[in-house]
Design a protein with these regions (language model features):
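Aromatic "clamp/platform" in nucleotide-sugar-dependent glycosyltransferases that forms part
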Residues: 285
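Acidic anion/phosphate-binding donor-loop and adjacent secondary structure
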Residues: 155-159, 187, 202-219, 223
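Short hydrophobic beta-strand element within catalytic cores of glycosyltransferases
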Residues: 293, 302-305
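Conserved donor-binding/catalytic core segment of Leloir-type glycosyltransferases
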Residues: 11, 203, 218-238, 244-247
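N-terminal subdomain of nucleotide-sugar transferases
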Residues: 1-68
Length: 371
């Protein structure tokens, strides 16, 4: 909200967003939209989707529900626009994809009727930032690119996409990265972004799920433990096999182990699973957060993780290990035996991503852009 309490009209253009058949898709973007609306802003959402046959959804869990998603639908009392664009797997023809998505600007302008934003926020640069850029140019307003991981960890490393991602990073009026690691990558781009900030995804769970992280209350190696693998095992970058190998290592040490995975569950079910789990195991190759690690800690479940994202900033050093079954098993045993022993509480460690801090950061940026 502007100084003086004036509502800002914001258009969110995002590659990921919940769909009618996939409510867990892009929940971190949905959290941001809810935050902006709670700040009093008028927010509209455009979620461009690639054209694809139903069978192609099996390639990635994030594609579930995309093929038959409606082009216009209601979410939380507000309309979501989902124009289609052409894209092939791994984007061998990026210029064709840019042209396909960029030409949707006129359609979006017509669908919004007389409503016009004062700023555009674009979650994930490739390829939807091309649409954000075209709309911003038509309306002569600023736009903000928001990087969560894919753009720099995957697209920037692909020969066919790297120059396009770098160009989009430069063209936006401000580039927001979800972690300091991503901001460090952005700062080394040539030319560098006009304005670079680090604003994490907000971490917030209801009081009914909040617990303290305590040592294991079960009998040591006599009762079964539940290890939570907090994502869809079909996503290769999450390394489900490493989690299974870690479970086998624990069993060789005398533990009775069960591993629970999460597939497209709504948020309240995810938090319930975190409450009943004895430990959360993160084995991802790439993460901006990961958000699930912070949420798990707030639910009272210890988190053992490979060194990914920002976990070193708040997890005990014994809980951040090498990406081997033995090291991860050592971390799990330490977490189960000791619980949270840091003098600084979990809430204080995660204060950088709480509602107040994230609200303040976005309020300052938006006020600066539209003033």
């Amino acid at each position: 909200m502007r100084d003086g309490g004036v509502t800002i009209q914001i258009l969110v253009v995002t590659l990921l967003h919940p769909l009618p058949r996939n409510g867990s898709r892009g929940v971190f973007v949905e959290d941001h939209i809810h935050l902006l609306r709670s700040m009093g802003h008028d927010v509209r959402v455009v979620n461009p989707l690639p054209r694809m046959p139903r069978f192609a959804e099996a390639r990635r869990s994030t594609m579930m529900g995309v093929a038959k998603a409606p082009k216009r639908w209601m979410k939380d009392g507000a309309e979501v626009l989902s124009p289609r664009f052409f894209a092939l797997p791994d984007h061998p023809y990026p210029r064709l994809t840019k042209w396909s998505i960029g030409r949707q600007a006129k359609t979006i302008e017509r669908q919004l009727d007389s409503w016009r934003p004062e700023v555009i926020l674009c979650h994930t640069l490739w390829p939807v930032a091309e649409l954000a850029q075209n709309l911003a140019a038509r309306w002569k307003i600023p736009w903000v690119g928001i990087v969560h991981g894919y753009d720099f960890d995957v697209a920037l490393e692909q020969k066919s996409l790297s120059k396009h991602v770098a160009e989009l990073s430069r063209r936006c009026d401000a580039l927001v990265c979800a972690s300091s690691r991503l901001s460090s990558i952005a700062s080394k781009l040539e030319p560098s972004p006009k304005k670079l900030l680090t604003i994490p995804c907000m971490t917030e769970i209801g009081k009914e799920w909040r617990r303290e992280v305590k040592p294991l209350s079960k009998s040591w190696k006599k009762e079964a433990i539940d290890i939570l693998f907090p994502t869809d095992p079909r996503r290769p970058e999450k390394r489900h096999l490493l989690a299974l190998q870690t479970g086998e290592e624990m069993e060789q040490r005398g533990w009775i182990v069960g591993i629970t995975t999460l597939r497209h569950q709504p948020r309240n079910i995810v938090f319930d699973r975190m409450l009943v789990a004895d430990v959360t195991l993160v084995t991802s190759k790439r993460e901006a957060g990961p958000l699930v690690a912070r949420e798990s800690l707030l639910c009272g479940t210890p988190v053992v993780s490979v060194d990914v994202g920002e976990v070193k900033d708040y997890l005990p050093e014994e809980w951040v290990t090498k990406a081997t079954p033995t090291a991860l098993a050592d971390g799990i045993e330490h977490a189960l035996y000791h619980g949270w022993k840091d003098e600084i509480s979990v809430e204080e460690k995660l204060a950088f991503s709480n509602r107040e801090q994230v609200t303040e950061a976005w309020s300052a940026l938006l006020s600066d852009l539209v003033s």
